[in-house]
Amino acid sequence: MTTTSDATTTTSEAGRPVGRGAAGSTTEPSRADRATREEILYYCRESVRVGLNFNTQGNISVRLPGAHDGADAIVITPSDVRYDAMSVDDMVVVGLDGTVLEGDLLPSTELPVHLEHYRRRPDVQAIVHTESTFVNVLGALGRRIDPVLLNMVLYAKGPVEVMPFEFSTNADFGRRSAELMGDDVDAVVWGNHGLLAVGTSLKLAFKVAVAVEENAEVLLRASAAGTPKVLVYADIDVPEGARLP
């Protein structure tokens, strides 16, 4: 979701939302931080290219260990900026306590949800929110996405549950989302809205989102023809040293 409130934003000459006095420092990002921002921008545009998002849908964040006076922070995409017009300087750095540390634009409206997931799971290093078609079909039906493809069970690590619909812009929603996902599965569906995927890297979180969308399509098509075989993560015997596809 990418809506913004007129009560808290103004619009820049480029047509982008700008915080009123709430922006953090505009210090030039470090080389490592800039590389993280470039990776986020790449996967934002890739999400549109492969059909996971459209227009300004979705958002991405990455954990920055120790970036806030020794505590973790995150860098997150801004609110309501098209990915083809976004630059690395548009992204916002926020402490896990919600303090904006760097950035001239407003962070994604779903920032509180990202923060709750990072707080619950220290293993999570990146979050990808998408609004893809087949995930949303199953989400609108309130139907859990069971793994029927290898990539789904390898990356998501189990069935992906569906939350009942509600607005996803507050910490209470974030806590419920993180609780439903749990500690062993790496995705959750927001009913009538989209998917939130996590990973130990942005590359992995993106692969989770791709795998769940592909699986959702196959699950729908296979269910129309019969009863698909559901895979169980614990039953998959991955050979030692094997690399994930």
Tell where the protein language model's regions lie, with residue ranges:
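Glycine-rich flexible loops
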Residues: 2-245
